[in-house]
Amino acid sequence: MILGYVNNTYFNQAPNFSSNFNFQFQKRLTKEDIYFIVPDYLIPDDCLQIHKLYDNCMSGNFVVMQNKPIQYNSDIEIIEHYTDELAEVALSRFSLIMQAKFSKIFKSEINDESINQLVSEIYNGAPFVKMSPMFNADDDIIDLTSNSVIPALTEMKREYQNKISELSNYLGINSLAVDKESGVSDEEAKSNRGFTTSNSNIYLKGREPITFLSKRYGLDIKPYYDDETTSKISMVDTLFKDESSDING
């Protein structure tokens, strides 16, 4: 049962993450260190942390699950990196859209108001415009062909999806960036299963307290990430919601 959470007990609150971890546990956690999320009647009378550093897991009644250890990049660092890359893709896409809007250049003399009036009338939807006989549309209007903008926008969309997929995969979340009109086969959907599972398993050090719990009570608990089970649970939850809607409707 999850009792609650411990707030920053193992960390020194240093700005630099690499020097933030406290390797010397000065205090064994007790009931006063836990922010409980369970009802009061489920809170034990006494709480003492189980850990091999103190008495080789011979006493205590709760463990603390930790985030990834510092020899890996933290989730925040990964998210910040991909946030910068996604912002770059979004900015490039905005730049392409602006390029598509500016498709014509009108040549004229400096301070020539007639050409300004022409541009204003054209973009305001005037059915016809009056110009001087000296105006030559072939010579005075330069067409900036933007045929490459649409394919570039498609590539920007695909790159954005790829970055989102990379971020999800690095966090151990199964994600597929394939964009196909014909749909995605089951084999394609599972093609990155090994990569996401390996990234999920970098949390194994954070699961080490489970071994303390097993040693304390003589159990054999082996946690692992099961992507298929996670998907099935999501499907069952969706099905349950649909059935509830049908009954209530």
Swiss-Prot record:
InterPro entries: Gp10, Gp10_sf. Keywords: Capsid protein, Late protein, RNA-binding, Viral capsid assembly, Viral genome ejection through host cell envelope, Viral genome packaging, Viral penetration into host cytoplasm, Viral release from host cell, Viral short tail ejection system, Virion, Virus entry into host cell. It is found in: Virion. Disulfide bonds: none annotated. GO terms for molecular function: RNA binding. It comes from the Viruses. The keyword RNA-binding applies. One of its GO terms (biological process) is symbiont genome ejection through host cell envelope, short tail mechanism. Belongs to the phi29likevirus portal protein family. Forms the portal vertex of the capsid. This portal plays critical roles in head assembly, genome packaging, neck/tail attachment, and genome ejection. The portal protein multimerizes as a single ring-shaped homododecamer arranged around a central channel. Binds to the 6 packaging RNA molecules (pRNA) forming a double-ring structure which in turn binds to the ATPase gp16 hexamer, forming the active DNA-translocating motor. This complex is essential for the specificity of packaging from the left DNA end. This is Portal protein. It comes from Staphylococcus phage 44AHJD.
